[in-house]
Amino acid sequence: MTDLGSDLGPIQLKNPIICASSEFTMTLGGIRAALKAGAGAVVAKSVNEAPGAARQLDIAEYVMLDSDWAVASWERAGLEASLFCRSGLAQTPLSEWIAMLARADAEARTHDAFVVGSITIADAAPAARIAATMEAAGLRWIELNLSAPHGREAVAGAVRQLADPEAVHDYVAAVRSATKVPLTVKLTSQSGDPLALAEQAIAAGADMLVLMGRFQGFMPDIETMQPILGSAGAIGGRWALPLTLYWISKCFKALPRTTPLLATNGMRCGDDVIRALLSGARGVEVASAVLLRGPGVIGEMFAGLETYCLRKGIVRLDEIVGRAADAALGYGALAPVKRTSYPWDRFIR
């Protein structure tokens, strides 16, 4: 029997699979569906105080891109499809939204799970006030999203993406001072030094880190010669998994081993969850897979993880967390590779 619980420090999850913040978790119905599917936690759609952020939902658009970067049918898109979108924040008035989340989290207790309140930042002080209000309403866990991929494209003052370590420290410290509940901080990899962002988030009081947010992207349609979506957008896909796991592994090795890391961006199946754990994550946040395949994918991921652990004789998830990261050598420590030819030699005369 394998214990698939995950130790996230102040949070003990029944399993490491978290339904990430997305349009799927923008309604009570979506949150309930993810809980019913077996998610260890569900991160609600983000909110903030900026009217421009809420209005961004009015221009939201979502497409799946296939491996040829063409728009694909949602019903036929496979595991390799990439989500390319403009998304927005929940438009429900904050007081109503937070009250709904509190009710949802009360329901989550009956599933031995959590509903997490998510804040995408515009300014630090309002984010801190929202966090305090969430705690006062009874929420047990808050996520601070500093990685909003639309930050560079949105109207001024709507949302921000923080890529400066000092700014990360200041925003996290402001929210940490306003609340005592466990705080997760979601970071971007589009920075000169993502590890420095992680270090500053922890120094400022983050309990857990989520790595890494989606990327800004641009893709033309070669037939119409126009930009898909009519603009830039945020993009993520299974192709991003090695990029996510690179920074998970680096943070796992550089930060104290007591720092819980959550991987996001690129997980599509149970095997990908395993890859994240081997890289140093203690859990995963999945969004695109749920949007594409429905909340049933959560149960499929859990089943894949359970089958793997039984096959490998793993009793606790801690046995595999970071195993591959610890085995990774720096280039300078690698032995010379002995070879007599290269694969591309067949093209050379």
Regions found by a protein language model. Give the residues of each.
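N-terminal capping/small domains of soluble enzymes
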Residues: 1-115, 120-128
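Flexible, active-site-proximal loop/turn residues at the rims of small-molecule/cofactor binding pockets
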Residues: 23, 48, 148, 215, ...
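Alpha/beta enzyme core
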Residues: 32-37, 41, 110-111, 122-262, ...
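Short beta->alpha connector loops at strand-helix junctions that form conserved
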Residues: 45-46, 265, 287-288
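C-terminal helical cap(s) of enzyme catalytic domains, especially alpha/beta-barrels
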Residues: 51-67, 220-236, 291-314
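Structural signal for hydrophobic packing residues in well-ordered secondary-structure cores
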Residues: 101, 105-108, 138, 179, ...
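C-terminal extensions of enzymes
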Residues: 291-313, 318-349
